[in-house]
Amino acid sequence: MREVVIASAARTAVGSFGGAFKSVSAVELGVTAAKEAIKRANITPDMIDESLLGGVLTAGLGQNIARQIALGAGIPVEKPAMTINIVCGSGLRSWRALRTRTGPRRR
């Protein structure tokens, strides 16, 4: 089995719907967070094999915002990306999808 790691994570600032970030698209916010996660991990974008994103309210942003964000963060076009949108559980489902692919954590 291939070893899989989560090297880093970052999130955007928290705001209210229609608030300070209303003119910034979710894709732009995601690119900022992805670039920061890559920077914190001290890796290069080409080292990332796959991107998963849990997102909500993605209508009007185009297809597969995970892919748009990955490309915006410099991850090569050859690397796959998947958006999961099931409202509040999106982040958890993203984690579950990753765990299903990699198997249970070993101690």
UniProtKB/Swiss-Prot annotation:
Which InterPro entries is this protein grouped with? Answer: Thiolase-like, Thiolase_N
The record places the active site at C88
Q: Name one GO cellular component term.
A: cytoplasm
> What are the subcellular locations of this protein?
Cytoplasm
Give the Gene Ontology MF terms in alphabetical order: acetyl-CoA C-acetyltransferase activity
Q: Which organism is it from?
A: Clostridioides difficile (Peptoclostridium difficile)
Among PANTHER family, the record links this protein to: ACETYL-COA ACETYLTRANSFERASE, CYTOSOLIC, ACETYL-COA C-ACYLTRANSFERASE
Q: What is this protein called?
A: Acetyl-CoA acetyltransferase
Instruction: Kindly state which reaction or reactions the protein catalyses.
Output: 2 acetyl-CoA = acetoacetyl-CoA + CoA
Where does the sequence pass through the membrane? Answer: none
Q: Which gene encodes it?
A: thi
Tell me, how does this one assemble? Homotetramer.
Q: Would I find Membrane among this entry's keywords?
A: no
Q: What is its EC number?
A: 2.3.1.9
What top-level class of enzyme does the UniProt entry assign? transferase
What biological function has been recorded for the protein in this entry? Catalyzes the condensation of two molecules of acetyl-CoA to produce acetoacetyl-CoA.
Keywords assigned: Acyltransferase, Cytoplasm, Transferase
Q: What's one Pfam family the UniProt record gives for this protein?
A: Thiolase_N
